[in-house]
Amino acid sequence: MTEWLISNQFTDYNHSVKFMEAKIQQIYNNLSDELVWLLQHPPLYTAGIGATDDDIIEKLFPIYKTGRGGKYTYHGPGQRIIYLMLNLKKRNKCDIKLYIRDLSNWIINVLKHFNILGEFKEDRIGIWVNNKGVEEKIAAFGIRLRKWVTYHGIALNVSPNLSHYEGIIPCGLKDYGVTSMEKLGVKVSLCELDDILKQEFHKIF
């Protein structure tokens, strides 16, 4: 069984990491159900294991080092953070590439509800949209596994202040931009979005 937790207040980043680390240990020991956690962070940057100082342009917000994959990304209001704590071993899916593909298909299917065509790129993890001939990222992935239990996850841009990305080179990809559902003309509440996330999740996971 997979539980869902929705946090309506901004969640401190360090608190979220400590929570996830405790939770995945419980899941591994069969002391807790799997969990999908939906939240928002206050404005901040996170540095994945591939992050370098070259990707920082200006320190507009606090920077948190984290053990997830990837480089620098931004988190803040108007962005739906999706942290997934799933036991891939119990699901007989001990395949990281398959997990990333499943995450991608999930978000692509969610975006279809809003007439947004999301795309998965093998060489650029995340979900991309073609906005007037320009490829822009609408959802960033940063995952980590411990004993085949996942944590960290997805940042989906609903209506964030996109200028906040200007302090970094997002995911180390300087030739590509970022976008949001709002920028693409879609206005949706997080509550509405969460309902679709749940609906589509159960079709893949």
Swiss-Prot record:
The active site is at C171. Keywords: Acyltransferase, Cytoplasm, Transferase. One of its GO terms (cellular component) is cytoplasm. GO terms for biological process: protein modification process. The record marks K137 as: Lowers pKa of active site Cys. In the reaction, the free carboxyl group of octanoic acid is attached via an amide linkage to the epsilon-amino group of a specific lysine residue of lipoyl domains of lipoate-dependent enzymes. Catalyzes the transfer of endogenously produced octanoic acid from octanoyl-acyl-carrier-protein onto the lipoyl domains of lipoate-dependent enzymes. Lipoyl-ACP can also act as a substrate although octanoyl-ACP is likely to be the physiological substrate. This is Octanoyltransferase. It comes from Wolbachia pipientis subsp. Culex pipiens (strain wPip).
